[in-house]
Curated annotation (Swiss-Prot):
Organism (species): Trametes versicolor (White-rot fungus)
Cofactor, how bound (note): Binds 4 Cu cations per monomer.
Cofactor(s) needed for function: Cu cation
PROSITE patterns in the cross-refs: MULTICOPPER_OXIDASE1 (PS00079)
Protein name: Laccase-4
Length: 520
């Protein structure tokens, strides 16, 4: 325990300067607790992993077995005392029980207890993240970066540096606990980059600093840990060459700005080819205070040898903004199925709606079951109608091509664009936001899709090769809380043959169900 405590202390010190902490993993403890933090100069209670925000960087190599023991020491009932952690982007083949979505894949971990997540990064590498998947708890702080390195990275010759110093996290930060604030906040109080930021009208607190050496090439890993807004990200005076989207390698694509939605990740190569100086890093949110006055929504790119002062660089108009449709997967780029809309084994159209309080998909608002879907399946329930109320769960056949469409009208999806995340898979986006064109030859492939605005009909495809119940939901956490989700039960009959939960997993529900309401 002494070595672990020392690591936590070191992590806290490093985070105070807006740098990503020393990496932990793939075998590690992750202690979840409450503490007061002031990342933008305003002090509030938060939910933290290992005592820091964002949570510590967890790393491993392609093929590694991750064993992460989550210890729940939460005591503040306003932000929930229970927790459940989702390892965003991992397929969890054969370990659906470790996916972490509360009441879909497990019961929450009760305060005073621990739970070991044990899964393997089989054939996966890239940029991931982890966060609470219980109510809106991650908005209160429980979110952090995760990287799986590939010793045989096909893009390795494009960069010189790829380590904890090249992680860039974007987070919306609220001065009020999620359960005490508005159901649908109109913007956050501040944007935090690597855990630091300023809020409008606040003090000029320290900004995060990312240091580079002139002449070197850096693989920057950009992660949106957002609960709500999307961001337009840029670095004054520098282009960015994207090589990865959501842990999928893509052909290099050079841009000067990236619009990134909640849950999405990008790797881009930044060449430090400018004068030795300080340059603003900018993350303009889609809601809230949408300016850079006084250094808000900003961080600093500092060349070694530059003065330790705020930059004086100015924002310029983007001339090479990212168009998602221009991203081409490096390997096996073709979408599954036939090259026409509907040319799949199973096509599903998802109609959205909102009644002022709840979101609906095909006229149903998702309500978490009291018994997790996976537990129901393993207990012998296989009918979609028996697992969840009609319309909340769709049974998908095995080894089939699936097409999902998200038509958006002027009235059916307030708060658009909505970023939708599918657990257990990546998918090909055969029709992207802002376009009526289709691409079945080499469409972008990822695990979070911007479903666009009025007139869009974003369409994705994937293949059912991963038995289990998988969540599909809006990654604006306030919208998920309001029912904006469905569950796919994939190859339901084979789940019991491919998924063997741990004994500790089986104990989660009896322990959670025995809690007093004040300890939930």
């Amino acid at each position: 325990m002494g070595r672990f405590s020392s690591l936590c202390a070191l992590t806290a010190v490093i985070h105070s300067f807006g740098r990503v902490s020393a990496a932990i993993g793939p075998v590690t403890d992750l202690t979840i607790s409450n503490a007061d933090v002031s990342p933008d100069g305003f002090t509030r209670a938060a939910v933290l992993a290992n005592g820091v925000f964002p949570g510590p960087l967890i790393t491993g190599n392609k093929g590694d077995n991750f064993q992460i023991n989550v210890i729940d020491n939460l005591s503040n009932e306003t932000m929930l005392k229970s927790t459940s952690i989702h390892w965003h982007g991992f397929f969890q083949k054969g370990t659906n029980w470790a996916d972490g979505a509360a009441f879909v894949n497990q019961c929450p971990i009760a305060t005073g207890n621990s739970f070991l997540y044990d899964f393997t990064a089989t054939d996966q590498a890239g940029t991931f993240w982890y966060h609470s998947h219980l109510s809106t708890q991650y908005c209160d702080g429980l979110r952090g970066p995760m990287v799986v390195y590939d010793p045989s990275d096909p893009h390795a010759d494009l960069y010189d540096v790829d380590d904890e110093t090249t992680i860039i996290t974007l987070s919306d930060w609220y001065h009020t606990a999620a359960s005490l604030g508005a159901a649908f906040p109109i913007g956050s109080d501040s944007t935090l980059i690597n855990g630091l930021g300023r809020f409008a009208g606040g003090d000029s607190t320290d900004l995060a600093v990312i240091t580079v050496e002139q002449g070197k090439r850096y693989r920057m890993r950009l992660l949106s840990l957002s609960c709500d807004p999307n961001y337009v990200f840029s670095i004054d005076g520098h282009n960015m060459t994207i090589i990865e989207a959501d842990a999928v390698n893509h052909e290099p694509l050079t841009v000067d700005s990236i619009q990134i939605y909640a849950g999405q990740r990008y790797s881009f190569v930044l060449t430090a080819d400018q004068d030795i100086d300080n340059y603003f890093i900018r993350a303009l949110p889609s809601a809230g205070t949408t300016s850079f006055d006084g250094g808000i929504n900003s961080a600093i790119l500092r060349y070694s040898g530059a003065s330790e002062v705020d930059p004086t660089t100015t924002e310029t108009t983007s001339v090479l903004p990212l168009d998602e449709a221009n991203l081409v997967p490096l390997d096996s780029p073709a979408a599954p199925g036939d090259p026409n809309i509907g040319g799949v084994d199973y096509a599903l159209n998802l109609d959205f709606n909102f009644d002022g309080t709840n979101f609906f998909i095909n006229d149903v608002s998702f309500v978490s079951p009291t018994v997790p879907v996976l537990l129901q399946i393993l207990s012998g329930t296989t009918s979609a109608a028996d697992l969840l109320p009609s319309g909340s769960l769709f049974a998908l056949p095995s080894n089939s091509t699936i097409e999902i469409s998200f038509p958006i009208t002027a009235t059916n999806a307030p708060g658009a664009p909505h970023p939708f995340h599918l657990h257990g898979h990546t998918f090909s986006i055969v029709r992207t936001a802002g376009s009526t064109d289709t691409n079945f030859v080499n469409p972008v492939r990822r695990d979070v899709v911007n479903t666009g605005t009025a007139g869009d009909n974003v369409t994705i495809r994937f293949t059912t090769d991963n038995p289990g119940p998988w969540f599909l939901h809006c990654h604006i956490d306030f919208h998920l809380e309001a029912g904006f989700a469905i569950v796919f039960s994939e190859d339901t009959a084979d789940v019991s043959n491919t998924t063997t939960p741990s004994t500790a997993w089986e104990d989660l529900c009896p322990t959670y169900n025995a809690l007093d309401s004040s300890d939930l």
